């Protein structure tokens, strides 16, 4: 706990005017900052002796669309198929959200000090834009490509910002909250044409009710006797 507070004090002293907030979580410290200060703060966190966060562990995107409005919205499924395990959210529990829809999260590790830290920056625009940190940590290469592919977040300055997990002809970004669960189109190989072709999605949306198996003690004795 003392080490965490020491790190927080060092962050506040060094980045007083460059960060929006410092949150002391259970697992690690989180810094919230604007994209305009991202590169400067990241460079300092990597190079300055009190920090020495020389290792970038992960970069990921977050979509806060409808955050705090509903715990589960899948075409009214909670009111039908999942009603037995679903509780309605009362109006007082709705969380107001006044920040941008998308955020980029960075996880850093200091091998010298054995510290972990999380950076979070909220990004705006269509598409959402944020500077690439690949010149600070080369390991950001594929992490940023993944976030671009799945969320449509553009990392300015990335030398090779291509899709990573979906095919290059894919339309949309599948981890966005408004992307259809069944997708837009499906891809298959056509042997006659000897190439891959796109077709309308053949999956039909439907409500799936989980099978519930209950053990009824009234019949256990009879089953044992028959067995």
From Swiss-Prot:
It comes from the Bacteria. One of its GO terms (molecular function) is quinone binding. It catalyses: a quinone + NADH + 5 H(+)(in) = a quinol + NAD(+) + 4 H(+)(out). Keywords: Cell inner membrane, Cell membrane, Membrane, NAD, Quinone, Translocase, Transport, Ubiquinone. Its EC number is 7.1.1.-. Belongs to the complex I 30 kDa subunit family. NDH-1 is composed of 14 different subunits. Subunits NuoB, C, D, E, F, and G constitute the peripheral sector of the complex. Pfam families: Complex1_30kDa. This is NADH-quinone oxidoreductase subunit C. The gene is nuoC. The keyword Cell cycle does not apply. It is found in: Cell inner membrane. The keyword Amino-acid biosynthesis does not apply. Transmembrane segments: none annotated.
């Amino acid at each position: 706990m003392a080490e965490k507070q020491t790190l927080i004090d060092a962050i506040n002293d060094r980045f007083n005017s460059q960060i929006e907030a410092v949150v002391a979580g259970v697992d690690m410290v989180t810094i919230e900052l604007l994209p305009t200060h991202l590169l400067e703060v990241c460079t300092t966190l990597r190079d300055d002796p009190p920090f020495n966060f020389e290792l970038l562990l992960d970069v990921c995107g977050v979509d806060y669309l409808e955050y705090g409005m509903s715990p589960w919205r899948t075409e009214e499924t909670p009111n039908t198929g999942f009603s037995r395990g679903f509780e309605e959210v009362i109006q007082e529990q709705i969380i107001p959200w006044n920040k941008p829809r998308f955020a980029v999260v960075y996880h850093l590790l200091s091998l010298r000090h054995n510290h972990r830290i999380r950076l979070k920056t909220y990004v705006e625009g269509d598409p959402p834009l944020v500077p690439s940190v690949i010149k600070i940590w080369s390991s950001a290469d594929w992490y940023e490509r993944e976030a671009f592919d799945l969320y449509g977040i553009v990392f300015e300055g990335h030398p090779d910002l291509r899709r990573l997990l979906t095919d290059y002809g894919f339309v949309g970004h599948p981890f966005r909250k408004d992307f259809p669960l069944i997708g837009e189109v499906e891809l298959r190989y056509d042997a006659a044409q000897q190439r891959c072709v796109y077709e309308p999605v053949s999956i039909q949306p439907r409500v799936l009710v989980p099978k519930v198996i209950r053990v009824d003690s009234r019949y256990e004795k009879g089953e044992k006797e028959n067995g």
